[in-house]
A protein has these predicted regions:
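Amphipathic alpha-helical transducer elements in NTP-driven molecular machines
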Residues: 11-18, 35-38, 42, 78-89, ...
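Basic, low-complexity terminal or inter-domain segments flanking catalytic cores
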Residues: 2-5, 81, 92, 98, ...
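Secretory-pathway/luminal and periplasmic proteins that interact with or process carbohydrate-rich
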Residues: 299-305
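Short, polar/flexible loop-turn hinges at active-site or ligand-entry regions and domain interfaces
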Residues: 73-76, 104, 124-128, 149-156, ...
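Metal- or metallocofactor-binding catalytic centers and their adjacent structured scaffolds
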Residues: 235-269, 275
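Intrinsically disordered, low-complexity regulatory segments
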Residues: 1-164, 168, 438, 454, ...
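C-terminal or mid-to-C-terminal helical accessory/interaction module adjacent to the motor/catalytic core
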Residues: 73, 95, 137-221, 258-262
Length: 691
């Protein structure tokens, strides 16, 4: 009997495929049955080799050895996943396996993950591609019935290779260059550094902003409505006008203009739009939203989440009304739902995957059994579908231009003619969006008529600085970076992709370049002193959002066979070579780049400073360190963060609530810090309530 080997990206996805295919016999690292072997990759099994594999001299960081630009790229099997790679390699070489299916995630990274394993395993057998946008059983069966030739995705693989190798070259060379120049570890990334630069520039603009006061005169009309004057820089000028208006007591209607307007329904979600709304309305980080969406996808409740499209293809039009009705009922929408399918259909704007949708399975699922976060994300996706196919929100806007005391005053009013899609938005998301401000209604007056003034007052305001970046605003900035400077018609501008933006933000936070501050629902992302210092010494070509966005566009062109991979890689190598030969340490930067002191070493009394992987004693002879990735704190289901490190160094102890035992029980305890005989840190527990 011959077998077809199916290789997925994760065990959970592999299990779902195995169930549909009838491969029900569980083996070590794979499923077997019905002519199929179904296994998985556990993410990236094969990784780019570190520099020292190419040459032992690269073990030591030196500017003299830069740039490091491999001519023949080398790969290694990840140490933590060697067993699973061995299983896949053995399965690929089994004599009874005559073909393979790449069923890793349907995108750039999924293509790369499979192909690297295939090549590292030395496999030569033919393989085809499973390309799905839904994990529903019907979609899986349809996908396996219509497998695609692997050659259709060669260009996608080339783009993935270029992305991976460009990131490696920029990260390795720039990190070593700037670490050597400034005498401390500095992590630099092709995507990460421009995103950090955007936050630093924004905070600099806020710090440099000087608010300016202004004054207006507001007239309350006897028949309803309020008319406002222009802004005055001088309070005395506004007070003089106020006095004149009070004496005059009437306004003359110079012009009344009424226009009927409409607000189109919002587009369906792509991943970035979903992450933005989830942050704005629910306070979720981009990574949390992606994690929830991925889980919902694997539970067959939504379609593929890592999409950059906000439209559907023409062949989906016929089934959409049924999906809208069924998902509406799942959320207790009993009234008829207007369904205008054509406004969400445009196959020309669909790339790898269509817009995010709930599935038919979602309409039948027990949503109450879902974790709260997943339930909220599903609600957002369903609400967006019901709104997107709805009718326009129509209203009449009235603008009044009046004269009082020789000065022009204006007033605006609004009357809703048809709620349209906003009815569904309020029904689905009313608690999240809150009560909307009632629009002002103006009196029905004729031009050149006069109206009495019921009251007049002076109002003081001031100009506002730019807003701090929330994840919502930063995602938007990443998505639209360089859009103004890109040629018209270029499809993708921006930094990163929908699939990678969340990870970029998380990496900046984890490395201590960004920090989240604020309430649970409204947190802003602020650059730390370390982040500001890094950007201060970075040359323009490394921190430029425009250059990074240009690279993303070129990767898309490679994906579409519109650009040769070699051309892109040559450009990256030339930029790196130029960077290495022309960059010098910035004058006066040493003080700026100084490590942050957070306390005193309990072993030798010298200063303890923060670095990328922990808090280290400045005394090179001392072995004291508090590791950020700390095994002791992990056993308590806690993190050793800056606040905890500060408390430990200052008081020698820190009280922790809701620690977890190995059996899952919670307890409170105090962690005590001491030192071993050789100076290494040592932790112990002092219990309060028992375990």
């Amino acid at each position: 009997m011959s077998y077809q080997l199916v290789v997925s990206e994760k065990p959970s996805v592999g299990a779902a495929y195995a169930k549909v295919l009838g491969a029900t016999n569980r083996q070590d690292g794979y499923w077997e049955g019905n002519g199929y072997l179904v296994s998985w990759c556990v993410g990236h099994l094969v990784e780019l080799a570190p520099p020292n594999v190419y040459d032992a001299k690269y073990t030591k960081w030196s500017i003299a050895d830069l740039p490091i630009l491999p001519q023949k790229w080398q790969y290694l099997v990840s140490a933590s996943t060697k067993k699973q790679f061995g299983i896949l390699q053995k399965l690929m070489h089994r004599p009874d396996v005559n073909s393979i299916v790449n069923s890793c995630d349907s995108g750039r990274e999924g293509e790369l993950i499979f192909r690297l394993v295939y090549q590292q395993a030395g496999c030569k057998k033919p393989f085809s591609r499973l390309w799905l946008s839904s994990m529903e059983e019907s979609a899986i069966r349809e996908g396996f019935a219509h497998l695609k030739p692997s050659t259709e995705y060669d260009a996608l693989y080339n783009a993935a290779l270029c992305r991976e190798r460009a990131d490696w070259m920029v990260g390795i060379n720039a990190s070593r260059l700037f670490s050597c120049l400034y005498g401390q570890p500095l992590a630099v990334g092709r995507v990460m550094t421009p995103v950090l630069a955007m936050t630093v520039v924004r905070e600099a603009a806020i710090a440099a902003f000087t608010p300016e006061k202004f004054y207006t005169v507001a007239l309350t009309l006897a028949d309803g409505g309020t008319a406002s004057s222009k802004r005055f820089a001088q309070k005395a000028d506004a007070e003089l006008l106020l006095s004149k208006c009070r004496k005059e007591g009437r306004i003359t209607v110079q012009k009344m203009e009424r226009k009927e307007k409409s607000e189109s329904p919002p587009q369906l979600y792509d991943l970035t739009a979903l992450q933005r709304d989830a942050n704005r309305l629910l306070g979720f980080t981009a990574q949390q939203t992606l994690d929830y969406a991925q889980s919902l996808y694997e539970k067959r409740l939504i379609t593929y989440p890592r999409t950059d499209s906000r439209f559907l293809t023409e062949d989906m039009a016929a089934s959409l009304p049924g999906l809208v009705t069924d998902t509406g009922r799942a959320f207790a929408v009993e009234e008829p739902i207007p369904i205008h399918v054509q406004q969400v259909i445009d196959g020309s704007k669909v790339t790898d995957h269509h817009a995010l949708l709930p599935t038919k399975s979602m309409a039948k699922a027990d949503l109450a059994a879902l974790p709260a976060g997943e339930r909220n994300v599903v609600r957002l996706i369903v609400a967006r579908l019901l709104c997107a196919v709805g009718e326009p929100h129509r209203y009449a806007e009235t603008t009044l231009t009046t004269i009082c005391a020789g000065e022009e005053f204006s007033a605006k009013g609004k009357v809703v003619l048809s709620e349209g899609w906003k009815t569904m938005e309020r029904k689905m998301l009313g608690e999240l969006i809150g009560k909307q401000k009632e629009p002002a209604v103006l009196p029905d007056v004729q031009e050149q008529s006069q109206c009495s003034v019921a009251g007049a007052e002076l109002k003081e305001g001031q100009t506002s600085p730019p807003k701090h970046f929330t994840e919502d605003l930063l995602l938007h900035a990443m998505e639209t970076a360089s859009a103004d400077s890109m040629p018209e018609g270029v499809e993708r501008q921006g930094i990163g992709t929908p699939a990678t933006r969340a990870a970029t933000i998380e990496k900046l936070v984890q490395k201590g370049f960004l920090e989240r501050k604020g309430t649970k629902k409204t947190k802003v992302l602020l650059p730390t002193d370390k982040g500001k210092a890094l950007i201060t010494v970075m040359p323009e070509e490394i921190q430029s959002p425009e250059m990074t966005a240009d690279w993303e566009t070129k990767l898309l062109q490679i994906e579409r066979s519109e650009m040769e991979p070699e051309t892109f890689m040559t450009e990256i190598k030339e930029m790196i070579s130029s960077l290495v030969t022309t960059t010098e340490a910035a004058k006066g930067a040493n003080a700026l780049m100084k490590n942050k002191i957070i306390g005193v070493c309990p072993n030798c009394g010298k200063s303890v400073v923060e670095r990328e992987k922990g808090w280290f004693c400045e005394n090179r002879e001392c072995r004291f360190v508090l590791w950020k990735d700390n095994a002791f704190f992990k056993r308590l289901s806690k993190r050793l963060d800056a606040h905890v490190a500060d408390k430990l160094l200052r008081d020698g102890r820190v009280r922790l609530k809701d620690c977890k035992s190995a059996k899952g029980k919670t307890y409170n305890a105090t962690v005590l810090l001491s030192c071993e005989a050789d100076g290494r840190s040592k932790f112990s527990l002092e219990f309060e309530g028992g375990c």
